[in-house]
UniProtKB/Swiss-Prot annotation:
SUPFAM superfamilies: Dehydroquinate synthase-like
Protein name: Uncharacterized oxidoreductase slr1167
A Pfam family matched in the record: Fe-ADH
InterPro entries with a match to the protein in the record: ADH_Fe/GldA, Glycerol_DH
A GO term for molecular function: oxidoreductase activity, acting on CH-OH group of donors
CDD domains referenced in this protein's UniProt entry, alphabetically: GlyDH-like (cd08550)
Keywords carried by this UniProt record: Metal-binding, Oxidoreductase, Zinc
Enzyme Commission (EC) number: 1.1.-.-
């Protein structure tokens, strides 16, 4: 007789793994899928993305009988913008929200749909982030400083991947998307690398595969926009990165790279740098922290590998590369202190990080190994940076 299995009480885990439907299609031909969400959609977008999608939206309205009024998310994915958009929803009474644009436009659209309990469709206009896929949104101040993130109850109902639209974006946006996506490995392996949870293990392994794809194919993709390799890298940055976040969920969080990004957004002069550019720099800072505090030689090797890769595709390696070479010591400290706030993801590192240690890492992303222990000793002695 088989042994009986005792029921085990487990906490309820809510997983938002993927959009309900993902289609690779020109936006103008996606009318049948949008019709399943309703006949009227409020289009949340910015001025540039509205221009890019204008003809497609006109075609959707003409050929599929959709009503698609426009609403701007500007000045940012901020509480004030969301308040204005909620009033617009009340006025228009749409059946669904249609987000068209980059990460902030899509985050705003997702949050608006979440707050108003409407269906949501996303149309990324670049491969700069995986925001079109995920059940997460970042909220900023009106001037672009990171404030907090919001976990949403589901991924978008529909994700439309229009490669022709994405190819019209400047190459810098894909480079930034590569930087944002490759962070999945360096952060997930630290935050969740020892987990035995099946989905978390799958997410971490997918992050490793994602890293390898980007290492192998990014340079060729950037040299041949529109090619099959280019599409593979777009898919990796836009879709596969989203899969990892969906599988790993709360157990597979960001760590220092995104925390450094959030800190940098507190500086107005950093706002011209793209999300993925700041995250890519943040990966180097995270690896430097592992070297400085733990003497981790694997981190040193990984940093050298990344520096070579960054040179190859044009990602920033230093504050100067981000246009922040002239920030004051006080501004650097302000950034570090925000990054080290008690609720920051930087504390997912397996050691304590102080603002002073972080400042040292931020200004030494190019330092050779032999200077690491000496630099950390100076920090410990409070003898300056």
């Amino acid at each position: 007789m088989a042994p009986s299995i005792s029921p085990v009480t487990q906490p309820l885990v809510s997983m938002a793994i993927a959009p309900t439907v993902v289609i690779r299609s020109a936006l103008a031909k996606a009318g049948e899928h949008l019709q399943k969400l309703g006949s009227k959609g409020l289009v949340v977008t910015g001025s540039h993305s509205a221009e890019l999608g204008e003809k497609s939206l006109q075609t959707l309205q003409k050929n599929y009988g959709l009503t698609l009024p426009l609403a701007s998310y500007l000045p940012d994915c901020a509480e004030s913008s969301l308040e204005q958009l909620r009033r617009r929803v009340h006025q228009e009474q749409p059946d669904f929200i249609l987000g068209i644009g980059g990460g902030k436009a899509l985050d705003t659209a997702k949050l608006l749909a979440h707050q108003t309990q409407l269906a949501i469709a996303t149309v990324p206009t670049s491969a700069a982030t995986c925001a079109g896929w995920t059940a997460l949104a970042n909220v900023y101040s009106e001037t672009g400083a990171f404030r907090y993130d919001v976990a949403l109850d589901r991924c978008p109902d529909l994700l439309i991947v229009d490669y022709e639209l994405i190819q019209r974006a400047e190459p810098r946006l894909l480079v930034a998307g590569i930087g944002d996506a490759i962070a999945k490995w360096y952060e997930a392996s630290v935050s969740s690398g020892q987990s035995s949870d099946t989905f978390t293990v799958a997410a971490v392994q997918q992050a490793r595969i994602l890293r390898d794809i980007l290492f192998q194919k990014s340079a060729e993709a950037l040299a041949q926009p529109g090619s099959e390799t280019w599409r593979e890298v777009v898919d990796a940055s836009l879709l596969m990165a989203g899969v990892i976040g969906g599988l790993g969920g709360a157990n597979c969080r960001t760590v220092a790279a995104h925390a450094v990004h959030n800190g940098l957004t507190q500086l107005p002069q950093a706002h011209h740098a793209l999300h993925g550019e700041k995250v890519a720099y943040g990966i180097l800072v995270q690896l430097r922290l592992e070297e400085l505090v733990s003497g981790n030689q694997l981190a040193a090797t990984a940093r050298r590998q990344l520096l070579s890769f960054y040179d190859e595709i044009g990602l920033p390696k230093t504050l100067q590369d981000l246009g922040l070479g002239r920030i004051s010591l006080e501004e650097l400290r302000q950034t570090a202190e925000f990054t080290c706030l008690p609720n920051s993801d930087i504390h997912r590192l397996p050691f304590t990080v102080t603002p002073e240690t972080l400042m040292a890492a931020m200004v030494s992303t190019l330092v050779e190994e032999q200077g690491t222990r000496q630099l950390f000793a100076q920090i410990q002695d409070n003898s300056g940076l």
